[in-house]
Amino acid sequence: MNMALTLFTNTALASLLVLIAFWLPQLNTYSEKVSPYECGFDPMGSARLPFSMKFFLVAITFLLFDLEIALLLPLPWASHTDNLTTMLTMALLLISLLAASLAYEWTEKGLEWTE
């Protein structure tokens, strides 16, 4: 019962915060809010510089692989558990998923920087 109450409370609080975050910015929209700010001076150029979409995709891919590798960090402590077979199976599954996703990115040329 405590677990269900905790999950419900966390879900309700997260949903409430997301709704507030989407609702509040729509209350006051005016031109000064969307203009670039340069310490009170008139802007010398456009502050909306374009960036490479390839850079963005490589950065997102790096973050995903970094998160997956962070999941492997507790493995040395998990090796002291009673059920070593389950731990090794899950670790092998995670490493296989990491290797398969790296192979997929490589074959789809997602890691190539030149366009």
Curated annotation (Swiss-Prot):
Keywords: Electron transport, Membrane, Mitochondrion, Mitochondrion inner membrane, NAD, Respiratory chain, Translocase, Transmembrane, Transmembrane helix, Transport, Ubiquinone. One of its GO terms (cellular component) is mitochondrial inner membrane. GO terms for molecular function: NADH dehydrogenase (ubiquinone) activity. Its EC number is 7.1.1.2. It catalyses: a ubiquinone + NADH + 5 H(+)(in) = a ubiquinol + NAD(+) + 4 H(+)(out). The chain crosses the membrane at residues 4-24, 55-75, 84-104. GO terms for biological process: mitochondrial electron transport, NADH to ubiquinone. It is an enzyme of class 7 (translocase). Pfam families: Oxidored_q4 (PF00507). Its main location: mitochondrion. It is a multi-pass membrane protein. It is found in: Mitochondrion inner membrane. Core subunit of the mitochondrial membrane respiratory chain NADH dehydrogenase (Complex I) which catalyzes electron transfer from NADH through the respiratory chain, using ubiquinone as an electron acceptor. Essential for the catalytic activity of complex I. Core subunit of respiratory chain NADH dehydrogenase (Complex I) which is composed of 45 different subunits. Interacts with TMEM186. Interacts with TMEM242. Belongs to the complex I subunit 3 family. This is NADH-ubiquinone oxidoreductase chain 3. It comes from Halichoerus grypus. The gene is MT-ND3.
